[in-house]
Amino acid sequence: MIYIVVTAISMIISSIIVKLKMKSYWQILAFLPLTFLGALRAYVGIDYTTYSIIQIPGILNGFSHIKFEPLAKQVVFLGYYLADRQHYFYIFSLFHIILMWFIYKYISENSKNISESLFLLLTSVFFTFSLSGIRQAISTMIAFYALKYLEKNKVFHFIFFIG
Protein backbone atom coordinates (compact mmCIF):
# COMPACT_ATOMS: atom_id res chain seq x y z
CA MET A 1 0.00 0.00 0.00
CA ILE A 2 2.80 2.42 0.84
CA TYR A 3 4.26 2.01 -2.67
CA ILE A 4 0.94 3.01 -4.23
CA VAL A 5 0.70 6.12 -2.05
CA VAL A 6 4.32 7.13 -2.70
CA THR A 7 3.91 6.53 -6.45
CA ALA A 8 0.76 8.65 -6.51
CA ILE A 9 2.41 11.48 -4.55
CA SER A 10 5.46 11.47 -6.84
CA MET A 11 3.32 11.45 -9.98
CA ILE A 12 1.12 14.28 -8.68
CA ILE A 13 4.16 16.41 -7.85
CA SER A 14 5.60 15.76 -11.30
CA SER A 15 2.29 16.62 -13.00
CA ILE A 16 1.95 19.87 -11.04
CA ILE A 17 5.47 20.90 -12.04
CA VAL A 18 4.65 20.22 -15.71
CA LYS A 19 1.31 22.08 -15.53
CA LEU A 20 2.91 25.10 -13.88
CA LYS A 21 5.61 25.03 -16.57
CA MET A 22 8.34 25.14 -13.96
CA LYS A 23 11.92 24.53 -15.00
CA SER A 24 12.84 20.87 -15.32
CA TYR A 25 15.21 20.85 -12.35
CA TRP A 26 12.16 21.23 -10.09
CA GLN A 27 11.28 17.65 -11.06
CA ILE A 28 13.70 16.55 -8.36
CA LEU A 29 10.86 17.27 -5.93
CA ALA A 30 8.93 14.38 -7.47
CA PHE A 31 11.75 12.05 -6.45
CA LEU A 32 11.80 13.13 -2.78
CA PRO A 33 8.99 10.79 -1.64
CA LEU A 34 10.90 7.87 -3.18
CA THR A 35 14.08 9.00 -1.49
CA PHE A 36 12.33 9.20 1.89
CA LEU A 37 10.77 5.78 1.40
CA GLY A 38 14.16 4.22 0.78
CA ALA A 39 15.87 6.16 3.56
CA LEU A 40 13.25 5.45 6.20
CA ARG A 41 13.14 1.71 5.64
CA ALA A 42 14.23 -0.56 8.43
CA TYR A 43 14.67 -4.31 8.19
CA VAL A 44 13.54 -4.30 4.57
CA GLY A 45 15.55 -6.43 2.20
CA ILE A 46 18.36 -8.84 2.83
CA ASP A 47 21.04 -6.18 2.67
CA TYR A 48 19.66 -4.26 5.67
CA THR A 49 20.32 -7.11 8.08
CA THR A 50 23.57 -8.20 6.42
CA TYR A 51 24.89 -4.64 6.36
CA SER A 52 23.81 -3.92 9.95
CA ILE A 53 25.22 -7.07 11.49
CA ILE A 54 28.26 -7.93 9.37
CA GLN A 55 29.37 -5.47 6.71
CA ILE A 56 29.07 -2.02 8.27
CA PRO A 57 30.62 -3.05 11.62
CA GLY A 58 33.38 -4.81 9.67
CA ILE A 59 34.18 -1.71 7.64
CA LEU A 60 34.10 0.53 10.69
CA ASN A 61 36.47 -1.84 12.50
CA GLY A 62 38.84 -2.03 9.52
CA PHE A 63 38.33 -5.70 8.68
CA SER A 64 39.98 -6.34 5.32
CA HIS A 65 37.80 -9.36 4.46
CA ILE A 66 34.74 -7.08 4.01
CA LYS A 67 34.71 -6.14 0.33
CA PHE A 68 33.21 -2.71 -0.36
CA GLU A 69 33.82 -0.27 -3.17
CA PRO A 70 35.84 2.85 -2.19
CA LEU A 71 32.83 5.19 -2.53
CA ALA A 72 30.65 2.83 -0.49
CA LYS A 73 33.25 2.77 2.29
CA GLN A 74 33.29 6.56 2.38
CA VAL A 75 29.48 6.59 2.58
CA VAL A 76 29.67 4.23 5.57
CA PHE A 77 32.22 6.40 7.38
CA LEU A 78 30.36 9.64 6.60
CA GLY A 79 26.95 8.24 7.58
CA TYR A 80 28.28 6.83 10.83
CA TYR A 81 30.00 10.13 11.62
CA LEU A 82 26.78 12.09 10.89
CA ALA A 83 24.92 9.77 13.27
CA ASP A 84 27.45 10.57 15.98
CA ARG A 85 28.47 6.90 15.95
CA GLN A 86 25.07 5.87 17.29
CA HIS A 87 23.23 4.12 14.43
CA TYR A 88 23.27 3.30 10.73
CA PHE A 89 20.25 5.35 9.58
CA TYR A 90 22.34 7.97 7.81
CA ILE A 91 24.37 5.32 6.02
CA PHE A 92 21.26 3.81 4.44
CA SER A 93 19.90 7.30 3.76
CA LEU A 94 23.07 8.38 1.96
CA PHE A 95 23.08 5.22 -0.14
CA HIS A 96 19.50 5.86 -1.20
CA ILE A 97 20.12 9.56 -1.88
CA ILE A 98 22.97 8.60 -4.23
CA LEU A 99 20.76 6.05 -5.97
CA MET A 100 17.85 8.46 -6.37
CA TRP A 101 20.16 11.22 -7.65
CA PHE A 102 21.30 9.02 -10.53
CA ILE A 103 17.74 7.81 -11.20
CA TYR A 104 16.58 11.44 -11.26
CA LYS A 105 19.41 12.48 -13.61
CA TYR A 106 18.80 9.55 -15.94
CA ILE A 107 15.04 9.99 -16.12
CA SER A 108 15.12 13.79 -16.36
CA GLU A 109 17.59 13.64 -19.26
CA ASN A 110 15.95 10.77 -21.16
CA SER A 111 12.22 10.82 -20.46
CA LYS A 112 9.55 12.80 -22.26
CA ASN A 113 7.04 12.05 -19.50
CA ILE A 114 8.54 11.94 -16.02
CA SER A 115 5.25 10.92 -14.38
CA GLU A 116 5.08 7.82 -16.56
CA SER A 117 8.73 7.07 -15.87
CA LEU A 118 8.09 7.32 -12.13
CA PHE A 119 5.15 4.95 -12.51
CA LEU A 120 7.31 2.47 -14.43
CA LEU A 121 10.10 2.79 -11.88
CA LEU A 122 7.76 1.93 -9.03
CA THR A 123 5.85 -0.82 -10.82
CA SER A 124 8.93 -2.55 -12.18
CA VAL A 125 11.21 -4.54 -9.92
CA PHE A 126 14.08 -2.04 -9.90
CA PHE A 127 12.93 0.17 -7.03
CA THR A 128 11.96 -2.75 -4.79
CA PHE A 129 15.21 -4.49 -5.75
CA SER A 130 17.09 -1.37 -4.63
CA LEU A 131 15.76 -1.99 -1.13
CA SER A 132 17.50 -5.38 -1.14
CA GLY A 133 20.60 -4.63 -3.16
CA ILE A 134 21.38 -0.95 -2.76
CA ARG A 135 25.01 -1.07 -3.91
CA GLN A 136 24.11 -3.13 -6.98
CA ALA A 137 21.24 -0.74 -7.77
CA ILE A 138 23.57 2.26 -7.47
CA SER A 139 26.09 0.58 -9.78
CA THR A 140 23.38 -0.18 -12.32
CA MET A 141 22.09 3.39 -12.34
CA ILE A 142 25.57 4.87 -12.62
CA ALA A 143 26.23 2.60 -15.60
CA PHE A 144 22.94 3.62 -17.25
CA TYR A 145 23.67 7.28 -16.58
CA ALA A 146 27.20 6.94 -17.99
CA LEU A 147 25.95 5.44 -21.27
CA LYS A 148 25.33 8.98 -22.51
CA TYR A 149 29.09 9.49 -22.62
CA LEU A 150 29.53 6.52 -24.94
CA GLU A 151 26.92 8.02 -27.27
CA LYS A 152 28.93 11.26 -27.30
CA ASN A 153 32.16 9.30 -27.87
CA LYS A 154 33.56 10.44 -24.50
CA VAL A 155 35.06 7.13 -23.46
CA PHE A 156 37.15 8.61 -20.63
CA HIS A 157 34.02 10.07 -18.97
CA PHE A 158 32.26 6.71 -19.28
CA ILE A 159 35.21 4.86 -17.74
CA PHE A 160 35.40 7.46 -14.97
CA PHE A 161 31.77 6.85 -13.98
CA ILE A 162 31.81 3.08 -14.14
CA GLY A 163 35.35 2.75 -12.77
Stretch-by-stretch model annotation:
Residues 22, 28-29, 107-124:
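Transmembrane-helix signature of polytopic, membrane-embedded enzymes
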Residues 1-33:
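Start-transfer (signal-anchor) and selected internal transmembrane alpha helices
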Residues 82-98:
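Loop-to-helix entry region of an early transmembrane alpha helix in multi-pass inner-membrane enzymes
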Residues 115-133, 137-144:
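Membrane-embedded helix bundles of polyisoprenyl
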Residues 49-57, 63-84:
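Short hydrophobic/aromatic helix or loop-helix immediately within or flanking a transmembrane segment
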Residues 143-156:
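Membrane-interface transmembrane helices that cradle and orient dolichyl/undecaprenyl
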Residues 126, 155-163:
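Membrane-interface alpha helices of multi-pass inner-membrane proteins
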Residues 94-110:
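Transmembrane-helix motifs of polytopic, lipid-linked glycan transferases
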